[in-house]
Amino acid sequence: MARVTVEDCIDKVDNRFDLVLLAAHRARMISSGSQLTVDRDNDKNPVVSLREIADTTISPEDLREELVHSLQKFVEVDEPEPDTVPLIGSAGASVDADDTEVAVERMTEEELLKGLEGLAPPEEQPEEDE
C-alpha cells in the first residue's frame, strides 16, 4: 500500500526527499492529535500522511510552512527600521552646524620614507628542511 501511495505523492511533491520530510512531519502531527483528513483504514500514521498528500486533502505547501515553523528556534520579529541616515559625501547632503572639522596631518613622501627607514626589519627565521 505504501509503495502505491508514494508513487501517487510524487505527482504532488517533486522531490522524494522533500516528500519524506513532509510525510514524517504530518505523521508526527497526527501522533500529537491533529485531525485526520482521510479515513484511517487501519493504516499507521506515515501511510495516512502519505494518503493525505496523495489525495491533496492537505497542501504540501502548507505542510512545508508548518515544518519550517516547527524547526525554527527563534521567531523573527519585524521591527521598524530606524530613520535613514544620509550617507557621508553623498550629493546634496546637508552639513549640520555642530559638525567639527578634524585636523589631519599631511605627510610628504620624503617624511614617509624616513619614517620607514627607522623601522627595524623583521627577523628572518631559518627554514627547517624535512
UniProtKB/Swiss-Prot annotation:
<dbReference type="InterPro" id="IPR003716">
    <property type="entry name" value="DNA-dir_RNA_pol_omega"/>
</dbReference>
<keyword id="KW-0240">DNA-directed RNA polymerase</keyword>
<dbReference type="GO" id="GO:0001000">
    <property type="term" value="F:bacterial-type RNA polymerase core enzyme binding"/>
</dbReference>
<feature type="region of interest" description="Disordered">
    <location>
        <begin position="109"/>
        <end position="130"/>
    </location>
</feature>
<dbReference type="GO" id="GO:0003677">
    <property type="term" value="F:DNA binding"/>
</dbReference>
<comment type="similarity">
    <text>Belongs to the RNA polymerase subunit omega family.</text>
</comment>
<keyword id="KW-0808">Transferase</keyword>
<dbReference type="GO" id="GO:0003899">
    <property type="term" value="F:DNA-directed RNA polymerase activity"/>
</dbReference>
<dbReference type="GO" id="GO:0000345">
    <property type="term" value="C:cytosolic DNA-directed RNA polymerase complex"/>
</dbReference>
<protein>
    <recommendedName>
        <fullName>DNA-directed RNA polymerase subunit omega</fullName>
        <ecNumber>2.7.7.6</ecNumber>
    </recommendedName>
</protein>
<dbReference type="GO" id="GO:0006352">
    <property type="term" value="P:DNA-templated transcription initiation"/>
</dbReference>
<dbReference type="Pfam" id="PF01192">
    <property type="entry name" value="RNA_pol_Rpb6"/>
</dbReference>
<comment type="subunit">
    <text>The RNAP catalytic core consists of 2 alpha, 1 beta, 1 beta' and 1 omega subunit. When a sigma factor is associated with the core the holoenzyme is formed, which can initiate transcription.</text>
</comment>
<keyword id="KW-0804">Transcription</keyword>
<dbReference type="InterPro" id="IPR006110">
    <property type="entry name" value="Pol_omega/Rpo6/RPB6"/>
</dbReference>
<dbReference type="InterPro" id="IPR036161">
    <property type="entry name" value="RPB6/omega-like_sf"/>
</dbReference>
<keyword id="KW-0548">Nucleotidyltransferase</keyword>
<feature type="region of interest" description="Disordered">
    <location>
        <begin position="79"/>
        <end position="98"/>
    </location>
</feature>
<comment type="function">
    <text>Promotes RNA polymerase assembly. Latches the N- and C-terminal regions of the beta' subunit thereby facilitating its interaction with the beta and alpha subunits.</text>
</comment>
